[in-house]
Amino acid sequence: MKSLESGLVRLFQLRIQNIVAKLKEGDKAPDFTVRDGEGQTVRLKDLRGKKVVLYFYPKDDTPGCTKEACSFRDSFAKFKQRGIEVLGVSFDSEAKHKKFAQKFDLPFRLLADTDRSIAESFGTYGEKKFMGRTYMGIHRMTFLIDEKGKIKKIFNQVKPEEHAEEVLAAFDE
């Protein structure tokens, strides 16, 4: 079972390699206004002067997405120490985000991109293929945004359990 799971994960990762985000490192990050799981308005422009991790994930409370969120949770003190704001983005509603954050004690904000506008502007929404099925969805990607609002790094391939430490290392480069 584990080798089947590993094979499926690798197949999915290979598919991700073929995604070309329309944004590049060094580009200005697109601004957005959206609500988080607590119903609070979040504007990217209001975070200028801070480093931001904007991580896109497919769905709350699913195995890979939970591992990734818990990875950020477990490393959150390190992000906070460095003054880095962590924001998760999916198509889930504010209510689902609130429930997910409470269930796993997530200390960062989850953004409800219910109209897909953020994912589309960052190039993370598109065709996906998994287990012989083709569908449209959000690709697991992460953007590191510097204090001036520029994209410092884009992660097109993400290992959910290790991702937070990988992101921290990239900010330290």
Ranges and model annotations:
Residues 4-173:
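Chalcogenol-based redox active-site neighborhoods
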